[in-house]
C-alpha cells in the first residue's frame, strides 16, 4: 500500500528532468503530433506524442527505416568530440525516420527543431514495440542538440503541455459533435 502511494507521489524521471513541448499536426496531417523533451542542458529528445495515430487505434508497427533518401541515412550519423563533429544538421522539417504500420499507413517522423543529430534510437529497429510501450523513454526516436544561440528560441513554434492538452480536448469535443451529428 505504501509503495503504491509512493508511485503516485513522485513524478517520473522524464517529468522531473525534461520539459515537454509539442508540435501538433505536422505538415498539416491531423493528429500526427510529435513531442520534444527538452532537458535543462538543452539536449532534446524527439518522441511521438500520446495522440499520434501510431499509438492509437490498435495499430501494429511493421517497420521503421532511418533511410531518408538514396544518399541520406540517419544511421550513418557519426558524432565525435566535444563539439559533436560529424553530426548531421537538421532543420525543423527534416525527416528522421519513416514508420510503416501493418494496415499500410506510413508515417514520417520529423525533427521539429533545428540542431545537430546526436543519435538515433537503433533499439526500436529490433523492437518496434518500444515505440508504443514506452514512447517517452526507451521508445524515443532521436536525440538532437540545438545550436547554443538558438536554444532559447527553439520552443517558439512549439506548444506547452497545457496548450497541447487544450488542443487534444478540442479535438475530442469536435469528434463527439461529429458522431452526434451523424446519428
From Swiss-Prot:
Keyword field contains Metal-binding: no
GO BP terms: dendrite morphogenesis; regulation of actin filament polymerization; regulation of filopodium assembly
Record keywords: Cell projection, Nucleus
Taxonomic superkingdom: Eukaryota
Protein's cellular compartments: Nucleus speckle; Cell projection, Lamellipodium; Nucleus; Cell projection, Growth cone
Signal sequence bounds: none
Listed GO MF terms: actin filament binding; actin monomer binding
One GO location term (cellular component): growth cone
Pfam families: GCV_H (PF01597)
Primary site of residence: nucleus
The keyword Nucleus belongs to this UniProt entry's keyword annotation: yes
Family indicated by similarity: Belongs to the ABITRAM family.
Purpose: May regulate actin polymerization, filopodia dynamics and arborization of neurons.
Name the UniProt record assigns to this protein: Protein Abitram
Gene that encodes the chain: abitram
